Amino acid sequence: MYAILYQTIAKTQPASRLALICLLLIGVPALGGCGMELPAPPPDLFHKFNSIKTGLGPADLLSVDLNLDGHVDLVSANTLENSLTILLGKGDGVFKEPRTFKVAAEPTTLATGDVNGDGIPDLLTNARGAEQFTVLLGYGNGSFRKLPGVRTGKVPLAIIPGDFNGDGKLDAAVTLTFDKMEIFLGTGDGTFKKGDSYSTGSRSFSGITGDFDRDGNADIALAASSSNSSAIRLFEGNGDGTFSNPLAIAKNLVPLALIKQDMNSDGLPDLIFTSAQGDNMYLMIARGDGTFDKEIAFAGGGGPIALTAGHFNSDDQVDIAVANSRSSNFSLIVRKADGSFHY
């Protein structure tokens, strides 16, 4: 299996070049949005930079500086061989020989954060086939110490790290297949205590944290979709590790992947998500009180399944890249200087 690396070509600002990473799954569409037939990159914007070998069945890809050298490193969750592949970056788009770490059955999701408060990035991954999630404590050199698994309910899906009780220690929210979210409160040494559980209304593969109502407490937003119910579920945090009943927004739009980004420069985290309905991406502008303006739709490629924000051209505006699983390509939503968008 391979990860495909595209690099932006910013002729006027070469120092601001960003990499767009896509996963390639043999025989099936990739979660990262690239299929077997790689599309031609848009002229003067992207070129195919490299192909990087991973483990079997890569299902998620994470970029983070694991060894604190200022270069972006990559982590791949390999579902078919129950492992993580660590790729340490050299800073020029090239990576060192991969390192493999065995984890529990069927990792499909990755997250990062400082779990034990030593200032070094750690890794968290779910074990879909083992009803747990795994914490790997980083040493700061690209190596890790795997801790005993943290037990969860059946079929853990997304892992969403954040400080939910305001004690300065990293906590985690874990979504489950059967319409549930579990809260785990960090102790500061890499272990967790089980907190409350919440109904999500439907299955969620993607979630984020943010202070959406500006009360100083961490909130959680989930992209929750199933055959009979779908919405963005917004759980407002109480600051003690508990959450209020969720507010359902963007109902019936079948959200899949969800990110936050200030898209109109007002200092508030807006929501952007891909949808399984109509091959659309949606933008929701935050009002700062936990509510959002009506969704703005952007039509794009077939099967938008993943997205990321970044500066993909030479201006200073935030753009969005969307990976399309069915049409095996990616689309760009470019923000103009006047605040409007071009798809």
Give the residues covered by each predicted segment.
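N-terminal secretory signal peptides that target proteins for export/translocation
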Residues: M1-A15
